Amino acid sequence: MSTPALLHQIQRWIEIETPSHDAAAVATLARLVQADALAAGLSAQLQTLGDEVGPLLTVSNRESGDVRPGILVLAHLDTVHPLGSLARNPLRIEGDRVFGPGGFDMKAGACVALTALKNVSARQANSLPVDLLFVPDEEIGSAKSRSLIENAARNARYALVGEPARAGGHCVTARKGIGALRLQAHGCAAHAGLQHHLGRNAIRELAHQVLALEAMTDYEQGVTLNVGRVEGGTGTNVVPDRAALAAEFRVPTQALAESVHARLMALEPCTPDVRLQIDAWLKRPPYEKTAASNELLAQAQLHAAKAGFELQEAPMTGGASDGNFTAAMGVPTLDGLGVAGDGAHTAHEHFLVSSLGPRLAFWTSLLEHLS
């Protein structure tokens, strides 16, 4: 496919707005992609994930009965941009840059991956089978898709993720894991004027806990903990009997994830007669670099050189992706293989037209020759 034809295809995808929480909108694009894949002779199956998110689309070049471990490619069709974003931030081309909500993250990369799979299928290359998953809820944690991603990973020799390239076109070989914390303090209500001494202020307790939680951040170890939301109380004339916070933690290794989780679950109240209710869990496991992923990177770098660009690895990133799931399962995973650009999740989000041709050539060569 020529660069103008590929660009036109990506523009069609961008013109269909797909916020994560709008199941119908995501389904509209999923059906368009499905029809395109079927027309190219690929199998393409939609799986409904309930009413809250759109369907998951699996596109594959497997022949009937082919159960060999293959290449799992991960992409997502949802974006962080709400409906109406396109009217405020219209699709437009300014020189080498293509602006539009969700183009860089990650409709361009997803379209490039699909086009590469169509190229490999058309050539009838004797390569590993490829399963390409278009996830509908990646931007909100992939809670509905996770089990399907992990199930596909069980039959994968490699995992390639079409998330946007990092600065300089670099790829991703490690990501932090993300955990969540919900903490409630339960005290005792009282009239703030008549019986203040009988009250047990849950907000006061929560203030102590916020300081303790923020103190767990350790930049040297790569651990961060952020209290992002607090709420409690009913009025200034009532000693509050309940207060709650929501926080997240990010960790570079599974060992640190377990350590932080243990510390969170061991938190104790600082105020007499106040009880804490703690719920902490890991939403995405850490994506750790391994010898096997280094070997995959080396292979990818050879194919990038053939396509005319140098593929370097970016430092570990605090942002997570669906690659966290595959890497945690021991599947050699390479991420950030999408197009070059900048401004993900912002109004100035854009990708570079000049990166489309080289990235398509790279993806096609990589899918064709990985063994």
For the regions a protein language model found, what residue spans apply to each?
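Acidic/His- and Gly-rich active-site-bordering loop/insert found
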Residues: 1-101
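Acidic/histidine-rich catalytic neighborhood of metal-dependent amide-processing enzymes
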Residues: 106-176, 218, 371
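Active-site metal-coordination/substrate-binding segment of hydrolases
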Residues: 68-134, 140, 347, 352-358
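Short beta-strand segments
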Residues: 74-75, 133-135, 159-163, 184-186, ...
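Metal-dependent amide/peptide-bond hydrolase catalytic core
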Residues: 1, 18, 48-50, 164-165, ...
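Short glycine-aspartate micro-motif
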Residues: 70-72, 98, 105, 157-161, ...
